[in-house]
Amino acid sequence: MSRTLFVTTALPYANGSFHIGHIMEYIQADIWVRSMRMAGHTVHFVGADDAHGAPIMLKAEKEGITPQALVARYAAERPRYLDGFHIRFDHWHSTDTPENVALSQEIYRALKSEGLIETRSIEQFYDPVKGMFLADRYIKGECPRCHAKDQYGDSCEVCGAVYAPTELINPYSALTGAAPVLKSSDHFFFKLSDPRCVEFLQQWTTGANRQGVKHLQAEVQAKTREWLGGDDGEAKLGDWDISRDAPYFGIEIPDAPGKYFYVWLDAPVGYLASLKSYCAAKGLDFDALLDPAGPTEQVHFIGKDIIYFHALFWPAMLKFAGRKTPDQLNVHGFITVSGEKMSKSRGTGISPLRYLEIGMDAEWLRYYMAAKLNARVEDMDFNPEDFVARVNSDLVGKYVNIASRAAAFITRHFDGELAYDGDTDALAAEFAQQAESIRAAFEAREYNRAVREIMAHADRINQAFDAAQPWVMAKGIGAADAATRARLQDICSRALAGFKALSVMLAPVLPALASRVARELFGANADFAWGDAQQLPQRVAPFKHLMQRVDPKLLDDLFEPPAAEASAPAALPGGEALADTITIDDFAKIDLRIARIVNCEEVEGSTKLLRLTLDVGEGRHRNVFSGIKSAYQPQDLVGKLTVLVANLAPRKMKFGVSEGMVLAASHADEKAEPGIYVLEPWPGAQPGMRVR
């Protein structure tokens, strides 16, 4: 029976180009979609750019463009990747669209009416210079456990400790270097801990769709059981902060000025927005298609790093907003190279665009990924030697080789006409059975099993062909009797029928090649469907070259670091070149003295300056203005020693006279990490000592 499916992949964040992980996920989903369509099912396969959030806003600001312009730039390059790897979405959209605004706000209002939205006052770090609340990734400081410097606000990359941002020692804003302050703000929470949500998720995470397929893979189900409380019955779900404060690039929360939906609320809603846009363009009824009681199956392909959002928040949001919940969540692992995490610095990064630009066949990669992917949450390893061996041995040596040998005999001696001696019904039934097994493997996402079975069939076809030795019969074909000619024609016809069946089985993986085989070799006027495997061909056109072998040297080019990266000049120290050389006499003219900071206070009317009162051992105090307000709180500097340019001519400023200059280190770009550092001598130095 024909089914209707709504299929999505995770939305790529629109502040960068596609990486190889995106391409792997899209290929995995594309293979599944193509196989389902070949079975006669209706599939709506949509994607979109995840176009909101602080990272996009800040990157656009840094480049001096609007967030919309940044998103549009990356959206414009998507087709080059998708078309290049034969990934065929029905529609590509964006979360920064009227459809997504309307749907996100509708879902929010529905959840609010269900009593599942709660307002709470929370304290967060706030950057007083940037004028915005800081997410954990924008806060850095000293790890409270191992004391490693410059660690993020939620975890330490050195010791692995997890902590709250408020536990960091000497925290600073990664955006400006300023010391953040704690500030209260009202936020909106989705009450995932509500007993209704917990009960629903306990049922949904262990449930199955209409086809009897579990919503979640076993590994994912086990993980959600941990989050839901496991077998002890104790609910462990926390509520979800779904709001962010202005300035923020996103969707405004209804009736809450200055508040925006957190990007992870409106991003998955983008699946629905893309489908709604597609339905409008195609004249389809969006609401009927996603009727919770309707037959449409909702299927998501995602990576293992975003399970929490998709297996808990997303289905609960949809359920209590009165919408259709997902039927299947297909989770995959990451890509490694030769068993290790990809690394540009080690020359093991794979750029999808570079892959295409150096002339590598997209279907080599599609085949290799299919040969490695399965339905479990496992990482897929790309091994260069294995890649070359599989493509050259399987696709060229086994699969294409059948057609190149058999078609030559048929076109040369039988004018392209195929004829079979014996029971063709049995042969057709054999191909039908094989194709059904492969189709089922693809539907179950056991792609590696499907590929193994296909190549086993190819081996048997080649073995039968070699055992019959048609080249021996062909040598004397001019003088051969009718039986010998019929035998030669039958051997080659059966091989080509097998090749056609293999092409049908490989069509989800190698769509471009299979289409060529169908149209150019066998004269079809449409791409293959699963039922074509059992339709024995009657004619074959002269063989044309179908696939090139992989040149191992291409792999060297693929992993070669980009020329710009290899030849880039060494980074300038501190972001600027060293100053011109001076003599010791020039340096001696500068009188550097140790000074104690007796007092420090903010300067009213200035966003950059602090007023320092310094003891330089002169029997009087000096007044010095310093542009270090973004990095220090006044009280933190009192009592500290520092270094003063003592013989600098006094400078009359708007706020008073500055009698010298305190030395501080910073990057040439004052907004760059890690900010400004006032020089502080070792303990034991005394005010008035000269620095020589």
From Swiss-Prot:
Protein name, please?
Methionine--tRNA ligase
Its biological purpose is as follows: Is required not only for elongation of protein synthesis but also for the initiation of all mRNA translation through initiator tRNA(fMet) aminoacylation.
One GO molecular function term of this record is:
methionine-tRNA ligase activity
Q: Which Gene3D superfamilies match?
A: HUPs (3.40.50.620), Isoleucyl-tRNA Synthetase, Domain 1 (1.10.730.10), Methionyl-tRNA synthetase, Zn-domain (2.20.28.20), Nucleic acid-binding proteins (2.40.50.140)
**Motif 'HIGH' region, residue range(s) on this chain:** 12-22
- Can you say where in the cell this protein is located? Cytoplasm
The protein's gene is named: metG
Q: Which keywords has UniProt assigned to this entry?
A: Aminoacyl-tRNA synthetase, ATP-binding, Cytoplasm, Ligase, Metal-binding, Nucleotide-binding, Protein biosynthesis, RNA-binding, tRNA-binding, Zinc
EC number(s) per UniProt?
6.1.1.10
- Cofactor: how bound: Binds 1 zinc ion per subunit.
Q: Which organism is it from?
A: Bordetella parapertussis (strain 12822 / ATCC BAA-587 / NCTC 13253)
Question: Where would I find the tRNA-binding domain in this sequence?
Answer: 586-692
**Stored InterPro entries:** aa-tRNA-synth_I_CS, Anticodon_Met, Met-tRNA-synth_bsu_C, Met-tRNA_ligase_1, Met-tRNA_synth, Methionyl/Leucyl_tRNA_Synth, MetRS_core, MetRS_Zn
Q: Name one Pfam family in it.
A: tRNA_bind
Give yes or no: UniProt keyword Protein biosynthesis.
yes
Question: Could you tell me what reaction this enzyme catalyses?
Answer: tRNA(Met) + L-methionine + ATP = L-methionyl-tRNA(Met) + AMP + diphosphate
tRNA-binding is among the record's keywords: yes
What is known about its subunit structure?
Homodimer.
- What's a GO biological-process term for it? methionyl-tRNA aminoacylation
Which residue numbers does the motif 'KMSKS' region cover?
341-345
Task: Identify the GO cellular component terms for this protein.
Answer: cytosol
Cofactors: Zn(2+)
Binding residues for ATP, per the UniProt record?
344
Q: Which family does it belong to?
A: Belongs to the class-I aminoacyl-tRNA synthetase family. MetG type 1 subfamily.
Record: residues binding Zn(2+): 143, 146, 156, 159
